[in-house]
Regions:
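Terminal alpha-helical anchor/extension segments at protein ends
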Residues: 1-125
Length: 125
């Protein structure tokens, strides 16, 4: 299947921010910024167990919010800093709606929205 008929998405993410890029309309290959999602992180709590549970819950909410901006993924490329990309790929694989999506990843530094869009577009072309 050519990329023209696929729903292609890209995400730049770190532990606190994500930028979602995709081909919004079927039939167009033009990538555009679909949205931004922020993860404020856990509050400062002296109880380590509570803090850990809060971080897990907030990360899950962060992933869910990102995924909600990308219905029916055929292919996704996830890039960013750290190891959060692998966690997000695992989340997608465990979510029935996204489990058949082809996911790839890379590591990259923070970029402007325009550079993220160009980076993802270049990846799929």
């Amino acid at each position: 299947m050519s990329n023209k008929n696929k729903k292609l998405f890209g995400v730049w993410m770190d532990t606190h921010n994500a930028t979602i890029v995709g081909t919004e309309d079927h039939g167009t290959e033009e990538f555009k910024i679909l949205g931004h999602v922020a993860n404020p992180g856990a509050d400062n709590n002296s109880n380590e167990n509570h803090l850990h549970n809060q971080e897990i819950a907030l990360t899950h909410k962060f992933f869910k919010e990102i995924a909600s901006k990308m219905p029916n993924i055929d292919e996704i490329h996830i890039t960013g800093t750290g190891q959060i990309q692998q966690q997000f790929i695992k989340y997608l694989a465990e979510t029935p709606q996204y489990k058949n999506a082809l996911a790839t990843e890379s590591t990259s530094n923070k970029m402007s929205d325009e550079n993220i869009k160009d980076y993802i577009e270049k990846h799929f072309n």
